[in-house]
Curated annotation (Swiss-Prot):
This is Undecaprenyl-diphosphatase. Its main location: membrane. One of its GO terms (biological process) is cell wall organization. PANTHER family: UNDECAPRENYL-DIPHOSPHATASE. It comes from Streptomyces griseus subsp. griseus (strain JCM 4626 / CBS 651.72 / NBRC 13350 / KCC S-0626 / ISP 5235).
Length: 290
């Protein structure tokens, strides 16, 4: 991998990680369109450490408060009913599905799941799901045709059941094209959470999974066509770009609809199918044994 490739891929990772359009799919597609090697699951996982570092800094006050309350709850029973302490436990509970499935499906994640036909399918299907979830949220917020505004849930209403559902939604993102934020935000909206609450828990929930996955994949850096230098460079680029994107996105969702992302996902999936059908792109473009 050249330094230019690592810069472009780091830029793509930073731009797309927090948007509900799938960063792993865009890394895969960028390499395929450019005629580069597929960066692979290891590069994707490690570059995501950069964007998760952006989450750690952006939500540093929330995270510090949650960690402090969670650690105190281990020895102080009176803290176990504290909202922040419970949030710490719910992030752990919500991380279980992706941990189990990530280990179980490792071979599929690094192979069949990177087929461009599957990516096109998930882009379209999950785009439709996000669109439905967005419309339901908008109906509650505006009252729909009957003008009956429904109060949506916040993170104070989050329990173990909803936390696990969020977790399984996150696990779906092991398939490129699904989108970690897209799946978890869609799940949150369908369960009745506000846009801001759904996005906030989505980003907090991703921290353990992404950091663990990136740490696990460190052993594969230096093998094949991905070396340490370009990988670290891409991770740094992803961090700086990702921080700017998450700051913008958290403001965007308070007043705007997710429909632009829905339309983009569906159009990208359709175009990808057309290019594959026309023979312009191979479903396995960029894949190699190294």
């Amino acid at each position: 991998m050249s330094w230019f490739e690592s810069f472009v891929l780091g830029l793509v990772q930073g731009l797309t990680e927090f948007l509900p359009i799938s960063s792993s799919a865009h890394l895969r597609l960028t390499a395929a369109f450019a005629g580069w090697h597929d960066p692979g699951a290891a590069f994707t996982a490690i570059s995501q450490i950069g964007t998760e570092a952006a989450v750690l800094i952006y939500f540093r006050k929330d995270i510090a408060r949650i960690l402090s309350a969670w650690f105190r709850s281990l020895t102080d029973r009176s803290m176990r009913g504290d909202h922040d302490a419970q949030m710490g436990w719910l992030v752990i509970v919500g991380s279980i599905p992706i941990g189990v499935l990530g280990i179980t499906l490792k071979d599929q994640i690094e192979g069949p799941f990177r087929d461009l036909r599957l990516i096109a399918t998930t882009l379209i299907v999950m785009g439709i799901v996000l669109g439905v979830a967005d419309r339901l949220a908008a109906r509650d917020e505006t009252g729909g045709k009957h003008r009956v505004v429904k109060e949506r849930k916040t993170l104070k209403d989050l329990g173990v059941k909803d936390g696990l559902i969020y977790g399984f939604c996150q696990a779906m993102a092991l398939i490129p094209g699904v989108s970690r934020s897209g799946a978890t935000i869609s799940g949150g909206l369908l369960m009745g959470y506000t846009r801001e609450s759904a996005a906030r828990y989505s980003f907090l929930l991703a921290i353990p999974a992404v950091l663990a996955s990136g740490a696990y994949e460190l052993k594969d850096v230096g093998e094949g066509h991905v070396s340490w230098g370009p990988t670290i460079f891409a991770t740094l680029v992803a961090f700086f770009v990702g921080y700017a994107v998450i700051a913008w996105f958290m403001k965007f969702i308070t007043t705007k609809s997710f429909m632009p992302f829905v339309i983009y996902r569906i159009l990208l999936g359709v175009v990808l199918f057309i290019l594959i059908w026309a023979g312009v792109l191979s479903p396995h473009a960029g894949e190699s044994a190294g």
